[in-house]
Amino acid sequence: MNQEVMNLFNQQAQPVSFDQIKISISSPEKILSWSYGEIKKPETINYRTFKPERDGLFCARIFGPIKDYECLCGKYKRMKYKGVICEKCGVEVTLARVRRDRMGHIELAAPVAHIWFLKSLPSRIGLLLDMALKDLERILYFESYCVIEPGLTPLKERQLLSEEEYLRAQEEYGEDSFTAMIGAEAIRRILQELDLDKIANDLREEIAVTTSELKPKKLLKRLKIIEAFQMSGNKPEWMILTVVPVIPPDLRPLVPLDGGRFATSDLNDLYRRVINRNNRLKRLIELRAPDIIIRNEKRMLQEAVDALFDNGRRGRVITGANKRPLKSLADMLKGKQGRFRQNLLGKRVDYSGRSVIVVGPELKLHQCGLPKKMALELFKPFIYARLDAKGFSATVKQAKKLVEKEKPEVWDILDEVIREHPVMLNRAPTLHRLGIQAFEPKLIEGKAIQLHPLVCAAFNADFDGDQMAVHVPLSLEAQLEARVLMMSTNNILHPANGQPIIVPSQDIVLGLYYLSIVAEGAPGEYKPDNAKNPMQGVYGDMGELEHALAAKAVSLHSKIKWRWTGIGPDGEPLTKTYETTPGRVILSGALPKHAKVPFDVVNKLMTKKEISAMIDTVYRHCGQKESVIFCDRIMALGFNHAFKAGISFGKDDMVVPENKWSIVDTTRALVKDYEQQYNDGLITQGEKYNKVVDAWAKCSDKLAAEMMGRISSVQKDEKGADKQVNSIYMMSHSGARGSPAQMKQLAAMRGLMAKPSGEIIETPIISNFKEGLDVLEYFNSTHGARKGLADTALKTANSGYLTRRLVDVAQDAVIREVDCGTTSGIKMRAIVDAGQVVATLATRILGRATAEDLVAADGTVIVKTGETIEERHLPAINAAGIQEVKIRSVLVCATKSGVCATCYGRDLARGTPVNMGEAVGVIAAQSIGEPGTQLTMRTFHIGGAAQIADSSFIESSFEGTIKIRNRAVAKNTDGDLIATGRNVAVVIVGSDGVERAVHRLQYGAKLRVDEGDKIKRGQRIAEWDPYTRPILTEVDGIVAYEDLVDGQSMTETTDESTGIAKRVVVDWRGSARTSDLKPAMVVVDRDGKALKLPRGSDARYFLPVDAIIGFDPGATVKAGDILARVSTDSAKTRDITGGLPRVAELFEARRPKDAAIIAEKSGTIAFGRDYKNKRRLTLTPHDGSEAVEYLIPKGKHIHLQDGDVVELGDYIVDGNPAPHDILAIKGVEELAAYLVNEIQEVYRLQGVSINDKHIEVIVRQMLQKVEVTDGGDSDILSGDQIDRTELTDYNEKLLAEGKKPIQGVPVLLGITKASLQTKSFISAASFQETTRVLTEAAVNGKVDTLEGLKENVIVGSLIPAGTGSMVADIRSIARRRDAMILQQKQAESGAMPVEELPPAAAE
């Protein structure tokens, strides 16, 4: 009886809360302990009675009843027999739900290897036994025998014997003299007999003594897996299965279809195969069948079990009846349709609906229009409860009837229920957190959801048929979070850059722009010298002005004088007069009254940018509530006046410049000229192409400028008053719709088109859309247009995948503490590109905490260490002329798991310091991923002039005095100053002695300034020829040739058009005769002896292939003259990987194709002996360490000479640097700066602004691992990769014990790799390569402590971020209290000490 009572309690088990999940390999005993019985038959259900067969795959006796509280034969029914086991059919009377969690098992007649541990690379069984996978498979699939016990025979242990060899050995040495086995039994036996401790010790000794390069890596891998088995308590023989678990039947259901057929889960088929083969094998063994038959059956059993676990990993894919591969257990987990991504990370939710959206201009910002029908359905439970409470209905059934009939009282109650109950609206794709926002519903007729126009930008919604989903937050907590955190009024700023996102667009912008136009000569305008009517156009009162407008005494655009009353800085009323227009006065009426928001904010032409700045000003000074009210007001104003203005355009508004054809003809003549030059052989095909494309691009731009000039000019009417501005220009200039590029296509010329490959077609489209295209032009333009459409589709998928990888790598970066107390930081300065300031210092440091005091020149501290730089500090920082600020960054944050608030700085979406528990990683990932679809996909070929123009000179962006560092300059024959060194740098020093800028000069650059010169902004410092790389002489003397033999290493060509002879170095390595020549030019003295260079070597300059020689032998040269030059055509059309592929390349930390070679030490360069087709360079470091050797392919131009001195980090060969090299050579800070700048570069091209800190968060996640260079006194081996935090933990322990700490260097991992290497195996498994991750985790017996967000979503608990971050704290407090109470109780009762108590269950 007692047992039955216990059973009663066992049934309704409460869900257990847990803190961590461990995964390990299950032992046969464990599988049996889960099982409720063995499955002996392959039958599923009886097709006549539809009852499950006994001992079959759906057996009710093993898995539980089909109907709640009813046994199979019907003897026991109802609750009262709960827990009784029917003696007739053996079924326990309980809930049918147990069929979802009761497991069965199959006893295998022969052991079988688990395919994951065998075939998932690297093969765990193979590593453990140190056997090749091929050999293992030969044993397992019964092709070879394996010697287990050689006995006294000459056979070796684990030697493989084929069938013949085995029989021969048996004959030779006798049957019992040795033991050889075959199949999984053999492997199991070997695994059982392994002595892991002994192997581990042997391996450690071997690693210590080995000298080769690759051996330790292999041994390390093996040692790791052996240690994994030792630590995790897994036994190696468990990788061979003797029992196969059978998952609960309701997870592999059999569903009756109409027509008497059944749809079944593939797993049932796979299980049936295993059971059939297993039963057949059992029978064959009983019948003592011949060995060969039994072996074949065992092999088939092995294959059946393989297919069940992972179909298709080995051998043929097992297919079902319709030739479709069967879904195995592994397939159930992996991929987008697998368990992780389909059901655990994203679920469908109830209490939701979706409908089309329409615009709701009369809504307030916090409202949305919800159709009554939808509201009635969504809020049903609330309505039922209310009807019950008010006594309209006694039962739910009655309430249901009332609602279905839509009685009037139901509508009243719906109104009550909805009041202040926010709903969430979501538009797919949800690319960032503003894709879901909360609104208060307002009931409307009709069936479409109404959306406030200002939130469209955040949702990226438009009203051309978009749909949105509505979700109802049910619990009080959910409603609270929706209201406080997700309400649209609380999301005014964009999390990516901190600018307002509730910005008017399109009609609203057009209306406000129209409102703020000024027109000359409009009626009733104010004229200062108006003697007849001096008071005309002077107003001081809003009513008076409105009256004048209504009477048409004055127009919206007339110039008037206006007396404005506002609030002064001291809070007192303040009046001021402004010259303005009535339109602007009306606009100013919407402004909140505040000292920092004067009339000047609206007294300008309101383009979209100005409106955004205005909203920003209002938000920063007046706070959130005022901004929301203000936004609603200007929205109404904008719509109203756009409607009143009635702006529209006709075809005559597209003005074609009348001088169009003359410009086009000029260009045509130019192009003809280039064609002729090409035909005469003066220029190459490539040069001609570049020049032609260039000419047409210039022509197109010139036409566009002409057209813009005509459209934007204001016409006068006969009275001299301004006519209305051109409508198209208004739309484009205000930022409402259309761009100059589109206007150019409408009214100037369509311009150059691209082929699908991205190359530009030489023939442009000269017509515009107003004139119409002819057939050929139309055909040309279809080319690029189709490519555009195809690109868009690809781009979306690519961008989504990038976002997914970013979220995955950054999901556990959460704010965990207020200040980690680190003293380090990173230096920030303005980004200057080709003399243009691209990002000012102020924008980069705003909202970040300082890492050291910011001190002005007079010694006053502007910002103290650890304080955040706010807007109010910026004027002082600019005034102090500070160029570089050291700020805190997440890259240097010392918080163990997560980041600290001080290092992160301001929360951009709120404008306040970041909150505890904010999931900054996910925000960073969304901010970088969301604009992904706006980036381009293709790699550009930038033709001709485009790239050259920006890289041939340096301009100063500061005023100051010039200093020249590493001065290696010489005056050449023309009297110009030439930089003859590789690291000459021009430093601009400000008046206060602070270095303002440092410019490294190109070798051979012509200096326009000298030491001590004063320089102004915009003045040129130096310039160089971008088309050539010069080889300069550094001494004065006479030119001599060495090994320059005409016809062997040099050719002389005469230019036909000019008759000038040109000497070019040709490839002399082609033939054996000439291959040992070393063509060079030597500078000699009068006696023909080579002159010495300052650094001691001869003045001998080796010439690369294709060098054009500049002097004849015997010519006199001065230092700085160009002896020879190499033409750099290659630089002109280098593919620039742009857009998304570039961003992905940087985040994945891939090595670029033509990676630059970077000097890893400062030192001297020497050329060694050439090696095959590579040049050998040796770098002898100045610090006396070992020389470094570089092998460089012959084709690459090395712009260094023998004996040149390079600094650490200089490029030896140009190209894109590999991020790993930057990290290794220049360190973390340089790497971060490089990645941030390169990624920002791509986004800047598209006009997308993202704050640096987001990229820093991702880079921090990429730098989490450290490679151990010296294990110190720990058991960690060098070459291992461990977490940064683990390293510090280990070292703290080691130093405390007075031992030698571990040394390591940071490693950069790409985002995919970093995601797969997170501590949490659940997170990694749900990301990619599920099988591999789970196999590895199981072998290591990994424990997932559920610290990140993803793991918690998967196990279904609250995420430890945001409002959920408190839960962890509360739990730990509760645990401490529990422990204290226990101790008190023990102290009182003198019970056993805490250590021996069973561990407390996690809350």
UniProtKB/Swiss-Prot annotation:
CDD domains linked: RNAP_beta'_C, RNAP_beta'_N
Pfam family, one: RNA_pol_Rpb1_4
Superkingdom per UniProt: Bacteria
EC number from the UniProt entry: 2.7.7.6
A GO MF label: DNA-directed RNA polymerase activity
Subunit structure: The RNAP catalytic core consists of 2 alpha, 1 beta, 1 beta' and 1 omega subunit. When a sigma factor is associated with the core the holoenzyme is formed, which can initiate transcription.
Family membership noted in the UniProt record: Belongs to the RNA polymerase beta' chain family.
Protein name: DNA-directed RNA polymerase subunit beta'
Source organism of this protein record: Methylobacterium radiotolerans (strain ATCC 27329 / DSM 1819 / JCM 2831 / NBRC 15690 / NCIMB 10815 / 0-1)
